[in-house]
């Protein structure tokens, strides 16, 4: 909240588990937006992993018939998958991503700062998705991915590989 424009920002906190990717959590976000006076001209910033960017993007896409949103993905998997491509949605009726829309974020902000906080499981999960992308990419990019040491990551190099993965 160091920026003047952010002084009026409202924080909406939700559980970031797949079990919370529900209509109830969505209604909570809609209610918070409504109580906070959000309009179609407001901006929702989704800071978190894939569950947060999926649900937040869907909330923004459907509140007041659509408002702008920005994704700031904090996991490697969300940086290379969930936060790009406009996929938004919630789980419903026991099915994953059963209700949603495609609506791209105004911007996606990638930072290696978040990647430095991840445990091994989260790094490997995102790296596996990058390898899938690499199979469809150039032989040079594929070689870079295979040569990257995910067990001792250089986060600046990793962020460059993320950028290639989402391009």
Question: How would you label these PLM feature ranges?
Answer:
Residues 30, 128, 163-167:
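Amphipathic, well-packed alpha-helical segments that form the structural scaffold of globular domains
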Residues 23-26, 56-57, 121:
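Conserved strand-to-helix beginnings and helix N-cap segments that scaffold or border functional pockets
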Residues 146-167:
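Oxyanion-binding "anion nests"
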Residues 16-18, 51, 76:
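Residue-level detector of flexible, active-site-proximal loop/helix-junction positions
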Residues 58-153:
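A glycine/threonine-rich phosphate-anchoring loop and its flanking beta-alpha core
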Residues 38-70:
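Active-site and donor-binding regions of nucleotide-sugar-utilizing enzymes
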Residues 1-43:
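ATP/NTP phosphate-donor binding region
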């Amino acid at each position: 909240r160091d920026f003047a424009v952010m002084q009026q920002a409202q924080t909406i906190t939700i559980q970031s588990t797949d079990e919370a990717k529900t209509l109830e959590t969505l209604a909570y976000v809609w209610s918070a937006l409504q109580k906070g006076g959000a309009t179609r001209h407001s901006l929702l910033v989704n800071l978190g992993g894939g569950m947060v960017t999926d649900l937040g993007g869907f909330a923004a896409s459907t509140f007041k018939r659509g408002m702008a949103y920005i994704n700031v993905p904090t996991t490697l998997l969300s940086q290379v998958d969930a936060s790009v491509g406009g996929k938004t949605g919630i789980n419903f009726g026991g099915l994953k991503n059963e209700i949603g829309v495609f609506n791209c974020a105004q911007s996606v902000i990638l930072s290696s700062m978040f990647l430095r906080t991840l445990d091994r499981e989260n790094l490997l999960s995102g790296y596996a998705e990058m390898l899938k992308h690499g199979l469809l990419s150039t032989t040079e990019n594929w070689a870079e991915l295979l040569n990257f040491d995910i067990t001792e990551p250089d986060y600046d190099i990793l962020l460059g590989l993320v950028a290639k993965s989402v391009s």
